[in-house]
Regions:
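An N-terminal hydrophobic leader/cap segment in hydrolases
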Residues: 2-47
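Alpha/beta-hydrolase superfamily serine-hydrolase fold, recognizing
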Residues: 32, 41-46, 52-245
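Broad phosphate/nucleotide-binding scaffolds in NTP-utilizing and phosphate-metabolizing enzymes
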Residues: 1-2, 119
Length: 245
């Protein structure tokens, strides 16, 4: 679909500048002003990872599911990892998305509140997600084939990296994953291998420059950027990976 002249001009204006984490977080938090959230069927849980309790918000498709004593036994579950450049966004900002996902699919949605950069560099957020996934996939009341791993943007990166890590460690293995415009690359420079970066990296709001800013916020070092758990596109062996959409 073509972009009209007025829209293109607005996008160009909004594309200027880099990432200000605090401003970006404040803008993202505006999504919390959702009058429908009082109707969402949800509950909060935590998973302990050794030095931190990772928060999870669980969304149910209906009232009956929310009130059941065994809320995960025999259920189909979507393990959701939100986007936001590893540095902005929270589960609370995705409540409408998660609630609608639960209602539309009839499945339970478990959204992970992983820790954010730059306060918590790679691999902290990834390990939070891995900890929750391991607890869910190895729980005696769940079956791996009933769980779908799903993430958007930075969450797609975390989902892809999590699956590679799960294969490497052998503790559990996702059977299927949905990667929604996943940020799996580590190079958004003018020399990028991808024409999409070179030709469309400017003037379209989320620019190549802003993506570089997000990567620098997430990475603890230059060496991190070469780690396939940081940029899954670098993984040379994709055997043993889940069915992927």
């Amino acid at each position: 679909m073509a972009i009209n002249i007025a829209t293109k001009a607005i996008l160009k204006i909004l594309s200027f500048g880099g990432i200000d984490v605090e401003v970006s977080r404040q803008l993202a938090d505006l999504k919390r002003l959702d009058p429908m959230k009082i109707f969402y069927k949800k509950m909060d849980l935590q998973v302990y990872n050794g030095d931190y309790e990772v928060p999870i918000r669980v969304f149910f498709p209906d009232e009956a599911s929310c009130l059941e004593k065994d809320q995960i036994k025999g259920r189909k579950i979507m393990l959701f990892l939100h986007g936001g450049g590893w540095a902005t966004e929270h589960v609370e900002n995705y409540e409408r998305v998660c609630s609608r996902m639960a209602q539309a699919t009839g499945q339970t949605v478990a959204a992970v509140e992983y820790r954010l950069a730059p306060e918590h560099k790679f691999p902290t957020g990834l390990m939070d997600c891995y900890t929750v996934a391991r607890a869910l996939y190895t729980h005696p009341d769940t079956k791996p084939e009933d769980i779908t791993l799903i993430g958007d943007s930075a969450g797609g990166n975390l989902a892809a990296a999590l699956s590679i890590m799960a294969r490497d460690r052998g503790e559990f293995m996702p059977k299927r994953q949905i990667l929604i415009y996943p940020a799996v690359n580590n190079d958004y420079s003018e020399k990028s291998l991808f024409s999409s970066v070179r030709e469309n990296g400017q003037d379209y709001l989320l620019t190549a420059g802003k993506l570089k800013d997000y990567i620098n916020l997430y990475a603890g070092s230059e060496e991190d950027k070469l780690n396939p758990y940081f940029a899954p596109i670098l993984e040379k062996d994709l055997s043993g990976q889940p069915d992927t959409l």
